[in-house]
């Protein structure tokens, strides 16, 4: 239909198709340059800081305590607070606790439970729900993705817990970046209302900016506690600029060799025992111990 309505100008049908494709490629490059100009040049994924890795594991544990199979933004918040011990009282979690008047992970979880009506952990199937059964919700993955983008924009060497909190509290810079992306997506939908609308349909949910509900209840909690969000944002940005959290300093090959050696040792110990004396949880416990000692767990991947 498009070819039938297009002017011939002495061109053959093949030449018309070539011109249309070239025009589409030019428009695509123009849009790509607009996105890069607004969001910056894409960089490789940044590593997670030791505190952030611990927070992701703690988020799964908090989901279990709330009888949830999916860890959302609120569980990320609880995970950051639960992992505050790694900051020696000087990290992002400690700053947030101080702003909340000493509110720790347990008190915040109780408040969240009151808002959602959650209760103690329930039985799932034939056994208790375990942290390894919990997955991150799409909203939590979106928060983590925005935190990584914020860390890249700041020139940070890793994704820290302060980046997570900045996103969860709806910091201005993060919202502006998301809004800019939404404007580009909206422009693309309008420009391609003829061909693109028929081929793709409506814009996918991943292109839409997150609603306040997608960021969890941290903003509501700060309002209830009477916290100055601007002052808190300044403190978190100062931690981010200072690089208060660093990626785990470890060699990947050495780490893998250490994990293999540990699990091999556990296997030999269990084989040496009589079958009725073997510990079925030995490998799981060894895996947890090595994960805490070496940094991010493979299950912590969110993409």
From Swiss-Prot:
- Signal sequence span per UniProt? none
List GO terms (cellular component aspect): chloroplast
Q: Which SUPFAM superfamilies match?
A: Double Clp-N motif
Subcellular location field: Plastid, Chloroplast
Indicate the residues annotated as transit peptide. 1-37
Chief subcellular location equals plastid
Q: What keywords is this UniProt entry annotated with?
A: Chloroplast, Plastid, Transit peptide
Kindly indicate whether the keyword Chloroplast belongs to this entry: yes
The UniProt annotation puts the region (Disordered) at: 185-214, 278-303
Q: Which InterPro entries match?
A: Clp_N_dom_sf
The UniProt similarity line reads:
Belongs to the ClpA/ClpB family.
Summary of the function given for this chain in its UniProt record:
Accessory protein regulating the assembly of the plastid Clp protease system.
This chain's protein is named ATP-dependent Clp protease ATP-binding subunit CLPT3, chloroplastic
């Amino acid at each position: 239909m498009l070819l039938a309505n297009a002017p011939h100008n002495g061109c053959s049908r093949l030449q018309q198709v070539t011109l249309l494709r070239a025009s589409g490629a030019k428009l695509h490059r123009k849009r790509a340059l607009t996105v890069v100009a607004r969001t910056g040049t894409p960089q490789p994924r940044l590593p997670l800081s030791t505190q952030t890795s611990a927070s992701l594991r703690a988020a799964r544990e908090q989901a279990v305590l709330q009888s949830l199979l999916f860890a959302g933004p609120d569980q990320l918040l609880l995970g950051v607070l639960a992992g505050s011990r790694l900051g020696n009282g000087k990290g992002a979690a400690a700053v947030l606790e101080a702003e909340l008047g000493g509110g720790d992970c347990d008190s915040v979880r109780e408040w969240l439970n009151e808002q959602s009506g959650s209760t103690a952990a329930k039985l799932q199937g034939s056994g208790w729900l375990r942290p390894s059964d919990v997955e991150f919700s799409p909203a939590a993955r979106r928060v983590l993705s925005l935190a990584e983008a914020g860390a890249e924009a700041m020139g940070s060497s890793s994704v820290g817990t302060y980046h997570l909190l900045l996103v969860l509290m709806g910091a201005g810079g993060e919202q502006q970046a998301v809004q800019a992306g939404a404007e580009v997506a909206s422009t693309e939908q309008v420009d391609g209302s003829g061909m693109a609308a028929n081929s793709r349909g409506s814009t996918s949910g991943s292109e839409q900016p997150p609603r306040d509900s997608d960021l969890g209840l941290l903003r509501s909690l700060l309002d209830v506690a009477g916290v100055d969000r601007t002052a808190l944002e300044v403190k978190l940005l100062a931690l981010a600029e200072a690089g208060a959290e660093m990626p785990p300093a470890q060699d990947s090959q050495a780490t893998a060799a250490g994990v293999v050696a540990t699990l091999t040792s556990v296997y030999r110990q269990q084989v040496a025992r009589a079958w009725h004396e073997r510990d079925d949880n030995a490998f799981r416990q060894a895996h947890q111990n090595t994960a805490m000692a070496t940094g991010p767990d493979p299950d912590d991947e969110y993409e």
